[in-house]
Every structure is written in structure tokens, then in C-alpha cells.
Amino acid sequence: MGVYLAVLFSLLVIEMAILFILVLPLPQRMRRWLYIRYSIISTNKKFRTYMVGIMIFVGLLFIDSWKRSQIRVSTYRNQKNPYIINSVTPVDALASRAYNQRNVYISGFIIYFYICILTVMSILRRIVEWNDKMKAGDDILKEKLRRKQKYLEELQKKKF
């Protein structure tokens, strides 16, 4: 139980750190570097297989914990007959419910952050591509400006 919880927490912390770095206002060079690294990693078939497997396990944990945390809890004794056995939910059942609710929260946040990372990387890809197009457009515009300046100089020479 301790190892699997440590793995879940470490996965959650890693995802939070990645998302934090991605949303920082970094310079364009750093954004491009992050996007290139993400592209390299995401095209690796082994990595994608591992990530899909991990997310399937986390999703199954989420569903299982959700179902197990939906037990009916009774904290009061039966008023009509207070001597009925098991009229109050046992402490073990309450503890199990609390553990399952904790697992729902942790696995839900892992899934949520994974979706957020994919979304932010999509936005980052668009930003990097848009800036590359702008730079390419700048070069084209500079070349057009040079040609027009040459043409203007030629016209001025012809005038005199």
C-alpha cells in the first residue's frame, strides 16, 4: 500500500511540476526547446505505451475507488430499537471509505493534470509555430523591403 501510494504521489508531483514549468512566461527559445523535447518524447512508441498503461491503471483506480467510496454511512443508532446490532457503521468501514475517497482525489487529480499538460502543450505548439511563421515572414518582408529600396535607388539615379 505504501509503495503504490508513493508512486501515485510522485506521479502527481511530477505532473504538477511539469505543468508549472509549462505555464511560466518563458522566453521563446526556452518554449521551443520544451516543445522539441515534448515532440521527441511523445513520438517514442515505448513512452506512449507506458503513459497509456499508467493512465489506464489510474483510471481504473479512480473508478474502483469511486464505487467503493459510495457506501452508506449511518452514524446514529436506530431510535426505535437502540439495541439492534450493527446499527452504526463500523469504524473499519468508515476508514475504508476515507481511504477510497483519498484515492479518488489523488487519481482524479492525476488524470486532470495529464489532460491539462496535453492541452498546454497543444497551446505551446501553436505559439511556437506562430512565432516561427512570424520570423519567416519577417525575413520575407525584409527581402521585399531591400528589393524596393534598390528599385527606389535606381529610380533616383535615373532621375538625376
Curated annotation (Swiss-Prot):
Lumenal compartment segments: 1-2, 67-103
Per the Swiss-Prot or TrEMBL annotation, the motif Di-lysine motif is positioned at 157-160
Record membrane topology? Multi-pass membrane protein
- A cellular component term (GO) from this record? endoplasmic reticulum
User: Its domain of life?
Assistant: Eukaryota
Its subcellular locations are: Endoplasmic reticulum membrane
| InterPro entries from the UniProt entry | BAP29/BAP31, BAP29/BAP31_N
Q: Which residues are exposed on the Cytoplasmic face of the membrane?
A: 24-45, 125-160
Alphabetic keyword roster: Endoplasmic reticulum, ER-Golgi transport, Membrane, Protein transport, Transmembrane, Transmembrane helix, Transport
Q: Give the transmembrane ranges.
A: 3-23, 46-66, 104-124
Name its GO BP terms in alphabetical order. endoplasmic reticulum to Golgi vesicle-mediated transport; intracellular protein transport; protein localization to endoplasmic reticulum exit site
Which family does the record assign? Belongs to the BCAP29/BCAP31 family.
Q: What does this protein do?
A: May play a role in anterograde transport of membrane proteins from the endoplasmic reticulum to the Golgi.
The free-text domain note is: The di-lysine motif confers endoplasmic reticulum localization for type I membrane proteins.
Tell me the protein's name.
Answer: Endoplasmic reticulum transmembrane protein 2
Species whose genome carries this gene:
Saccharomyces cerevisiae (strain ATCC 204508 / S288c) (Baker's yeast)
Classification from the root reads:
Eukaryota, Fungi, Dikarya, Ascomycota, Saccharomycotina
Q: Which gene encodes it?
A: YET2
